[in-house]
């Protein structure tokens, strides 16, 4: 199998066929990375198009390193073209008093791309389509199966076979129980998130709501408001063509009727709500979602008994949004799996999947812990006593400087020993005490 300097191999040259279920950020990245490594890819997504709702997503340097190999840089160029055009990040208290204004230059922020979640998915999906990969949208997988030599899915009563199956269908995964026998309870974290994104035309003619467009000027703006047990973020994207907002509460307060009405109620006693409410109230009802937040340790067993199926992304290790790493870690999962398959080869697919789990587990567990700490920081602001009572390093090197592909080359053999001989090992990409 010929491999070029970037690590890319000729299409379908490895002899390995990979079925991927779920085309969120993790599944899309897995499909693209597996294709880059010479594997044949078959994709299934139950929705007729990629998932649209959400707010902003931040592609950080640890994931951007993976994307640099896609399309000779064309995917990174697309991220740069659609990233938020910001010059400052502003922090306010619940009265609307500006507490902090930090410089931000989207064109100089090293390997850090903030953009609409739906735009990111569109960019990934379009790149995948350009690769002429076998993609089935609006297709439900009803069953999973494996033998000693193959694995597959059942779709429309038909069994489709491959060398391995990647289950990347999210935190409420339907495939996970069939891959791992481990119970996967999702205890709530006593927290709720509300997220919205809509076109700026919804507020453009309303003088009480369009103030944010004036604040954005020729570019975009990003404002965060902190109160006790509550944080509100809002701003613009794609040169103020879109409005986004999100609200995080430490309480479980899922909306009984309208998510917008629930958020307006949550911020109702904030003095600044008189400024925020007209904007929030313009949100189209189908452009807002509410979610109970979950966190738990990663699934202990990502790989099926016969080693032919693996769970990746939020299906294996859900993150709180405060970690800012959900999609980024899914991208890392994808890159590590594809490379492990390339190194192990067709005869050792089960080993590749088990090595992937070993290389990834400690890192995602550490990042999950950081997400809880970040949540506690953001929801425990006390402006009367100096603001943040807890402070985390914004861009720790162990997290953002990690090169997951380099790690595979350096630690593959150690992970093999951990899998085959039961060696206890510490792997890279985690904080050093």
From Swiss-Prot:
Name of the featured protein: FAD-dependent monooxygenase notI'
GO BP, sorted A to Z: alkaloid metabolic process; biosynthetic process
Biotech utility: Notoamides have been shown to exhibit antitumoral activities. Notoamides A-C show moderate cytotoxicity against HeLa and L1210 cells with IC(50) values in the range of 22-52 mg/ml, but the IC(50) value of notoamide D is greater than 100 mg/ml. Moreover, notoamide C induces G2/M-cell cycle arrest at a concentration of 6.3 mg/ml.
Active site, renumbered: 195
Organism: Aspergillus versicolor
Pfam families, A to Z: FAD_binding_3
Function statement: FAD-dependent monooxygenase; part of the gene cluster that mediates the biosynthesis of notoamide, a fungal indole alkaloid that belongs to a family of natural products containing a characteristic bicyclo[2.2.2]diazaoctane core. The first step of notoamide biosynthesis involves coupling of L-proline and L-tryptophan by the bimodular NRPS notE', to produce cyclo-L-tryptophan-L-proline called brevianamide F.
GO function terms (MF aspect): FAD binding; monooxygenase activity
Protein family membership: Belongs to the paxM FAD-dependent monooxygenase family.
